[in-house]
C-alpha cells in the first residue's frame, strides 16, 4: 500500500508509549483502574511507632471522589457484576473507616461517611436484585460475590442481603468450594486462585502462600496482595512496595486508583505487536528502541521460563500469552518452538488456557492454532491443528446467539480471532502446506464457520457505522470485514462489504479523546479497558482498511455459481418476508445456504435410497429457508440447529418421494398393510399423563410414566413378511430413528418427546391417507382436460376438516414444530424445571394453535403453487374439493385460486395472532424482565418465531414456484425397477 506516514508514526508512537512507565523489576501495565481493587488496597493498615494507621489513604479518597449520586461506583461498569463488586468492596471500605476509630486516618465527617454507606448499601441491594447468574460471564464471580457479602454482614448485622439470584449463586459457589482444599494453594505449583486470595479470607493460612509472591505481588492482583498483606502474621515489605509502585505507576498515576491486574507486561506487549503485525504493519514501520526492548522482554521470558509464559514474568503460564508470544517472535523471524505449549496445554479435544481449567476458551484455542500455523513447518503439528480446528468449529456450531468468550464481553472479539486464524488455515491448505490434515467434512464446516463469522458483523453494523457505539468493538468489526475481503465467498458482496468498512472508519474517525477509547469490555474480576491495546486495534483497523487485498482464499472449499445464485435471489426477493430487505442480504443468505449444500449432499443417502425420483433440486434451496429466516431478524440460532433442521427438511422431501415413488407403489392395492407397518414401527403404549425432563431412558425421572410411542427395531413376524414390507420398514425405521433418537431429542422432556412421536406417526399415516384420497384423481391424470375444468375429490370429509388434519399433517410442519420444541426445551429451559418447551397449560394450548394454523396455511400456499404438478401426478389438491368447484363459476381455476389464497391469508393472520398471544402468555408466566427463566423463555420464543417465518417463507415461495422433485410418471417402469431390487 501507499506509505501512510501519519498511521506509521502513530503506530510507532504507540509502541514507544508501552514502555513509558516500564520498570526492570515490576514491568508495566496500562489496564484501567477498578473501584473493587482500590477498595481492597484502601483497607490495608500498618502499625507505625505503635499506632495502627491506614497505609494507603489516597485509595480511600479516590473512592469518595468517585461514588455516584445513586450510591454505587459506576466508572467502568459494562456488566451488572462490575457494579456489584465495585460497590460491595467500596461499601466494606466505608464501613471499616466509619467503625474503626482507633486507626489513625485523615479527618472525615463521620456523618457524611455513614450517609455514603447507606446509599451504597441501597445501591448494592438494587444491583443484587437484578443479578442474573446465568448470564454472568466473569471468571470466579461465584466465589468472589459471596466472599464479599460475608464480611459485610459480619461488619453490620443490618447488611443482610436477600435477593432472587442468591440461591442459584450459592448453589454454584458451594459446588465449586466443595472441591477446594487449602493445601492446593500451599504447594509449589501456582494456581489461578492466588489471583483472588481475598475470596479465601478465613479459609486459608496466608503465611503458607508467602512463597508464591512475585516481586511482592500475589499473581499480579492488587486486591489479592492487599488481602495477603492484611492477614499474614508477619509484615511483608515487598508486598507493600509492590502496592506503592502500582498506585504510582499503573493507570491511576498516583490518584489512589489501582487496576485489577498489574503488571501485564507479556499480555500487552504480545497483543499489541501481533495486532499491528496482523494488520500489515512491518517491523520496519515500528522500528524504534522500544520495539527492540519489547521483543527482548518476550524472547527473554520465553527462553527463561521454558517456552510457556504467563501475562507477566514469573506468573502462572497460560496458553494465550504463550501463543501470542510465539506468533510475535515467528513474525519477526525469531525461533520460538511450540513444543512446550503443546506439552503443557494440550488436552484430549482442545488446548487449555492453563492447567486445570474446567471450561475451555474459544479465543485461547484460536491463539494456540495461530501459533502453530505461524511455524515454518506447520505440517509437523497436523494432529494439533486438526484438533483445534475441530474444537473451534464445534464451539461455533454449538453456540446459540452471539458467540461468547470468558475473557471479553464483546462477541466480535472471539469472532475476529476466529476469522483471522481460519483465513490463515485455509490459505495454508490451499498452498498444500497442510496435506491430509483436515477431512472433507471438516473443511465444509470450516467454510460455513468462516462465512458466518464474517457475515454477522456485516449484518449487525449500526446505522452510524459503529458496532454497539464502541470504538474497540468497531475496530474488531472493521478487522473482520477486511479479512472477509480476502475470502472468495464474499466476491459477490464486495460493494456492501467495502461500504461497511468505509462507514466503520468514518465512525472511528469521529471519536476522539481518551475517554472515548476506554471501552470496558475485557474481563478480569471486573471489566477493564486496556487503553494501549484498544489503540492498537484502532490503528490496525485503519491500516487494514487501506491495505490492498491479500491473496484470495476459499476457492478450494466452494466456488459460487453466478447464474443460479442470481436467479434464486430474484425469486426469493419477491416473497413478502424479503421485499423490504436489500438484495445483498438475500444474496448473502443464499451464499451461506450454498455452503451447507455440499454437507447435505454428502449425507443425502444416509436414510433414503432415493430410487426413481427426479433430480433433488430442492437441496440447492432448502438451506436458504433456514439461513435467510435466521439472518432476517438476526436470530442467530446455533449453526448445529440450522444444519439439523436443514437435514430434517431434506428428509421430509425424501420421505414424500419415498412414500409416493416406493411405498405407495408397493402397497398400492393394500394400503392397510402399509398402515399396519407404521403401527408396528411406532407402537403406542400409554397416553401422556405428565410433564417432566428425561434423563436418557424412556421414563420420566419424576413420574415414571413411559413413552406413549415406542420404536420397533425390526418388523414383527419377519418370516411372514414380504421383501417389499422389509424394504419399506427398513427405510422408515431409519428415518424415524434419526428423528426420535436424535441427541437433542433424547435430552428433551418426556412430554415433548411424546408429542413429537405422536406427530411423527400422524405424519406417516397422513401420507397413506393422502395417497388413498388421491387414487381416484390419479386415475384421471392422463385424461386430457381443459384448464377450466376442475377435478372434484370424492373425499367424504369437508375441505375444512381435511386441510386442518390429514392435509396439515402431510406437509411435515406439525412434527417439525415438535422437533424444534424438543430442542428448545432441552437446550433452553432453566435448570431444575420440568424441561417442557411450553411449561404452562396456556402455553401448550397456544403453541398447538400456532402449529396448526402454520401447517394449514403452508398447505394452502403449497397447493396454490403446485396445482399443475398435483394434476400431472394425480395428487389430491385443495382445489379439488367440491367447495371450490361450486365457487368457480365462469372464472375457472383463477377464481378458485383467489378463493384459496384468501383462506391462506386468514390462516396466516390466525397464526400471527396465536403467536402474539403465546408471547404474552409466556411473558406472564415467566416474567417480563430479567432472570434466567424470563431470558430463556424469550430466547425460545425468538427461535420459534424464526421457525415460523421459515414455514411462512416456504408457503410464499411455493406460490411463486414449486420446488419439489417430480415423481416419474411411468408407474409401470417404477414398478419394474422396484421388482428388480428384490431379484
Curated annotation (Swiss-Prot):
GO terms, biological process: diterpenoid biosynthetic process
Q: Which residues bind Mg(2+) 3?
A: 862-863, 866, 870
* Regions of compositional bias (Polar residues) in chain numbering: 688-698
Q: What cofactor is needed?
A: Mg(2+)
UniProt keyword annotation of Transmembrane helix present = no
Q: Which reaction does it catalyse?
A: (2E,6E,10E)-geranylgeranyl diphosphate = (+)-copalyl diphosphate
Question: What InterPro entries does the record tag this protein with?
Answer: Ent-kaurene_synthase_fun, Terpene_synthase-like, Terpenoid_cyclase/PrenylTrfase
Q: Where is this region: Disordered?
A: 685-721
- Sequence positions that bind Mg(2+) 2: 656, 660
Q: What class of enzyme is it?
A: isomerase
Q: What does this protein do?
A: Involved in the synthesis of labdane-related hydrocarbons by catalyzing the conversion of geranylgeranyl diphosphate (GGDP) to (+)-copalyl diphosphate ((+)-CDP).
Q: Which PANTHER family match?
A: (E,E)-GERANYLLINALOOL SYNTHASE, ENT-COPALYL DIPHOSPHATE SYNTHASE, CHLOROPLASTIC
Identification of the protein by name: Copalyl diphosphate synthase
- Species of origin reads Phomopsis amygdali
Organism classification: Eukaryota, Fungi, Dikarya, Ascomycota, Pezizomycotina
Gene name in the database record: PaDC2
Amino acid at each position: 500500500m501507499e506509505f501512510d506516514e501519519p498511521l506509521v508514526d502513530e503506530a510507532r508512537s504507540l509502541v514507544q508509549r508501552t514502555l513509558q512507565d516500564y520498570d526492570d523489576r515490576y514491568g508495566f501495565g496500562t489496564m484501567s483502574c477498578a473501584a473493587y481493587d482500590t477498595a481492597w488496597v484502601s483497607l490495608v493498615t500498618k502499625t507505625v511507632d505503635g499506632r495502627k494507621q491506614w497505609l494507603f489513604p489516597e485509595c480511600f479518597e479516590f473512592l469518595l471522589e468517585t461514588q455516584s449520586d445513586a450510591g454505587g461506583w459506576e466508572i467502568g461498569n459494562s456488566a451488572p457484576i462490575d457494579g456489584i463488586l465495585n460497590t460491595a468492596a467500596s461499601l466494606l471500605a466505608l464501613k471499616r473507616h466509619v467503625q474503626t476509630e482507633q486507626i489513625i486516618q485523615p479527618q472525615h465527617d463521620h456523618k457524611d461517611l455513614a450517609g455514603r454507606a447507606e446509599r451504597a448499601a441501597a445501591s448494592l441491594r438494587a444491583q443484587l436484585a437484578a443479578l442474573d447468574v446465568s448470564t454472568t460471564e466473569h471468571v470466579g464471580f461465584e466465589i468472589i460475590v459471596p466472599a464479599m457479602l460475608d464480611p459485610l454482614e459480619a461488619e453490620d448485622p443490618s447488611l443482610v442481603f436477600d435477593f432472587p439470584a442468591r440461591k442459584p449463586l450459592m448453589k454454584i459457589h458451594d459446588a465449586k468450594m466443595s472441591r477446594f482444599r487449602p493445601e492446593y494453594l500451599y504447594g509449589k505449583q501456582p494456581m489461578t486462585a492466588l489471583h483472588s486470595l481475598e475470596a479465601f479470607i478465613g479459609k486459608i493460612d496466608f503465611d503458607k502462600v508467602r512463597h508464591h509472591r512475585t516481586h511482592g505481588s500475589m499473581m499480579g492482583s492488587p486486591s489479592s496482595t492487599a488481602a495477603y498483606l492484611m492477614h499474614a502474621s508477619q509484615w511483608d515489605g515487598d508486598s507493600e512496595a509492590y502496592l506503592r509502585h502500582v498506585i504510582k505507576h499503573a493507570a491511576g498515576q498516583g490518584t489512589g486508583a489501582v487496576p485489577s491486574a498489574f503488571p501485564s507486561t507479556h499480555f500487552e506487549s504480545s497483543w499489541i505487536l501481533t495486532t499491528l503485525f496482523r494488520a500489515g504493519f512491518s517491523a520496519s514501520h515500528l522500528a524504534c528502541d522500544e520495539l527492540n526492548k519489547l521483543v527482548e522482554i518476550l524472547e527473554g521470558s520465553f527462553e527463561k521460563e521454558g517456552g510457556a509464559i504467563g501475562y507477566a514474568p514469573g506468573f502462572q503460564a497460560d496458553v494465550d500469552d504463550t501463543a501470542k508470544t510465539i506468533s510475535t517472535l515467528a513474525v519477526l523471524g525469531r525461533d520460538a518452538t511450540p513444543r512446550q505449549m503443546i506439552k503443557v496445554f494440550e488436552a484430549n479435544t482442545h488446548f487449555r488456557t492453563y492447567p486445570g481449567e474446567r471450561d475451555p476458551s474459544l479465543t485461547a484455542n484460536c491463539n494456540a492454532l495461530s501459533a502453530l500455523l505461524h511455524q515454518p513447518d506447520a505440517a509437523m503439528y497436523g494432529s494439533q491443528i486438526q484438533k483445534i480446528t475441530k474444537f473451534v468449529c464445534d464451539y461455533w456450531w454449538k453456540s446459540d446467539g452471539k458467540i461468547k468468550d470468558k475473557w471479553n464481553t464483546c462477541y466480535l472479539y472471539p469472532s475476529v480471532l476466529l476469522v483471522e486464524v481460519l483465513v490463515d488455515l485455509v490459505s495454508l491448505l490451499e498452498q498444500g502446506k497442510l496435506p491430509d490434515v483436515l477431512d472433507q467434512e471438516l473443511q465444509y464446516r470450516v467454510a460455513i464457520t468462516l462465512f458466518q463469522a464474517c457475515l454477522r458483523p456485516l449484518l449487525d453494523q449500526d446505522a452510524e457505522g459503529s458496532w454497539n457505539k464502541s470504538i474497540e468493538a468497531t475496530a474488531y468489526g472493521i478487522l473482520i470485514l477486511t479479512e472477509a475481503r480476502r475470502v472468495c465467498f464474499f466476491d459477490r458482496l464486495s460493494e456492501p462489504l467495502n461500504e461497511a468498512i468505509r462507514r466503520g472508519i468514518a465512525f472511528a474517525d469521529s471519536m476522539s479523546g481518551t475517554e472515548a477509547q476506554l471501552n470496558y469490555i475485557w474481563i478480569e474480576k471486573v471489566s477493564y479497558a486496556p487503553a494501549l491495546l484498544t489503540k492498537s486495534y484502532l490503528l490496525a483497523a485503519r491500516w487494514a482498511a487501506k491495505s490492498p487485498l491479500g491473496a484470495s482464499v476459499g476457492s478450494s472449499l466452494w466456488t459460487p455459481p453466478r447464474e443460479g445464485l442470481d436467479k434464486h435471489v430474484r425469486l426469493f426477493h419477491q416473497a413478502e418476508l424479503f421485499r423490504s430487505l436489500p438484495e445483498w442480504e438475500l444474496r448473502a443468505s443464499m451464499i451461506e445456504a450454498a455452503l451447507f449444500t455440499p454437507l447435505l449432499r454428502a449425507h443425502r443417502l444416509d436414510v433414503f435410497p432415493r430410487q426413481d425420483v427426479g433430480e433433488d433440486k430442492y437441496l440447492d434451496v432448502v438451506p436458504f429457508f433456514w439461513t435467510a429466516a435466521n439472518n432476517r431478524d438476526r436470530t442467530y440460532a446455533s449453526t448445529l440447529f440450522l444444519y439439523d433442521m436443514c437435514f430434517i427438511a431434506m428428509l421430509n422431501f425424501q420421505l414424500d418421494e419415498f412414500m409416493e415413488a416406493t411405498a405407495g407403489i408397493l402397497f398400492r392395492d393394500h394400503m392397510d398393510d402399509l398402515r399396519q407397518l407404521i403401527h408396528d414401527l411406532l407402537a403406542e403404549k400409554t397416553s401422556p399423563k405428565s410433564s417432566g425432563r428425561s434423563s436418557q431412558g424412556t421414563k420420566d425421572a419424576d413420574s415414571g410414566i413411559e413413552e406413549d410411542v415406542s420404536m420397533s427395531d425390526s418388523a414383527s413376524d419377519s418370516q411372514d413378511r414380504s421383501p417389499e414390507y422389509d424394504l419399506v420398514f427398513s427405510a422408515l425405521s431409519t428415518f424415524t430413528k434419526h428423528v426420535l433418537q436424535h441427541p437433542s431429542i433424547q435430552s428433551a422432556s418426556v412430554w415433548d418427546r411424546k408429542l413429537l412421536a405422536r406427530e411423527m406417526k400422524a405424519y406417516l399415516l397422513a401420507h397413506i391417507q393422502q395417497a388413498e384420497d388421491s387414487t381416484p384423481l390419479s386415475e384421471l391424470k392422463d385424461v386430457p382436460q381443459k384448464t377450466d375444468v376442475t377435478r372434484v375429490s370424492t373425499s367424504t370429509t369437508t375441505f375444512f376438516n381435511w386441510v386442518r388434519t390429514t392435509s396439515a399433517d402431510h406437509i411435515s410442519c406439525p412434527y417439525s414444530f415438535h422437533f424444534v420444541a424438543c430442542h428448545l426445551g432441552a437446550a433452553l429451559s432453566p435448570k431444575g424445571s420440568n424441561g417442557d418447551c411450553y411449561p404452562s397449560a396456556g402455553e401448550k394450548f397456544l403453541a398447538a394453535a400456532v402449529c396448526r394454523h402454520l401447517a394449514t396455511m403452508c398447505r394452502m400456499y403449497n397447493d396454490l403453487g403446485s396445482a399443475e404438478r398435483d394434476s400431472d401426478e394425480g395428487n389430491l389438491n385443495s382445489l379439488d374439493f367440491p367447495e371450490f368447484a361450486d365457487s368457480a363459476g365462469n372464472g375457472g381455476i383463477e377464481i378458485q385460486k383467489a378463493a384459496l389464497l384468501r383462506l391462506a391469508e386468514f390462516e396466516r393472520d390466525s397464526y400471527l395472532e396465536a403467536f402474539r398471544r403465546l408471547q404474552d402468555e409466556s411473558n406472564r408466566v415467566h416474567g417480563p424482565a430479567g432472570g434466567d427463566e424470563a431470558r430463556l423463555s424469550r430466547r425460545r420464543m425468538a427461535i420459534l418465531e424464526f421457525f415460523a417465518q421459515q414455514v411462512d417463507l416456504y408457503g410464499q415461495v411455493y406460490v411463486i414456484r414449486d420446488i419439489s422433485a417430480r415423481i416419474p410418471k411411468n408407474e409401470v417402469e417404477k414398478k419394474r425397477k422396484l421388482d428388480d431390487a428384490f431379484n
